[in-house]
UniProtKB/Swiss-Prot annotation:
One of its GO terms (biological process) is killing of cells of another organism. This is Leukotoxin-activating lysine-acyltransferase LktC. The lineage of its organism: Bacteria, Pseudomonadati, Pseudomonadota, Gammaproteobacteria, Pasteurellales. GO terms for cellular component: cytoplasm. It is found in: Cytoplasm. Its EC number is 2.3.1.-. GO terms for molecular function: acyltransferase activity. The gene is lktC. Transmembrane segments: none annotated. Involved in fatty acylation of the protoxin (LktA) at two internal lysine residues, thereby converting it to the active toxin. It catalyses: a fatty acyl-[ACP] + L-lysyl-[protein] = N(6)-(fatty acyl)-L-lysyl-[protein] + holo-[ACP] + H(+).
Length: 165
């Protein structure tokens, strides 16, 4: 670990402290969600005039890890952050209203020619899977990939939870 690493951690922690949702979370959850992102360079931190304004992190999950994550969002281990090709937004912090700027910047990342998933929660108790198309991905290809993704995830969840028709 070096000074740059600690500066990143400090900037991200400051954003968490200014987020109504994140400020309630524990230091353990901060470490679990932020340190693997920094170590794997799977994050974006926006800074304006030397002040952090927004942050997001992502993990590339295998189908098995994805099912585990959907069941328990605090279940990711550091090794699982790069376990597959199913990209998930793990953390999104924009306490000063810079979400649109963060979306614009994330969609311009060259390897974002894929779809991105996240769990959204309005109640903090339940979430829904949201889907975003990477900026370099055309709509037709994105739809085809999303349909395939839904089929594979649906089958895996059905198997995991023993759902029947």
């Amino acid at each position: 670990m070096n000074q740059h690493y600690f500066n990143l951690l400090g900037n991200i922690t400051w954003l968490w402290m200014n987020s109504p949702l994140h400020r309630e979370w524990s230091c353990e959850l901060l470490a679990r969600n932020v340190i693997p992102a920094i170590e794997n360079q799977q994050y974006m931190l926006l800074i304006d005039n030397d002040v952090p304004i927004a942050y997001c992190s992502w993990a590339d999950l295998s189908l098995e890890t994805e099912v585990k994550y959907i069941k328990d969002i605090s279940s990711l281990t550091p090794e699982e952050w790069q376990s597959g090709d199913r990209r998930w937004i793990i953390d999104w912090v924009a306490p000063f209203g810079h979400s649109q700027l963060l979306i614009k910047n994330v969609s311009e990342i060259p390897d974002y020619s894929r779809q991105i998933y996240t769990l959204l929660s309005k109640t903090k108790r339940t979430g829904k899977i949201a889907y975003f198309k990477g900026g370099n991905l055309d709509k037709k290809t994105a739809k085809k990939r999303f349909d395939t993704y839904q089929e594979r995830l649906g089958a895996a969840l059905k198997n995991e939870f023993n759902f029947t028709k």
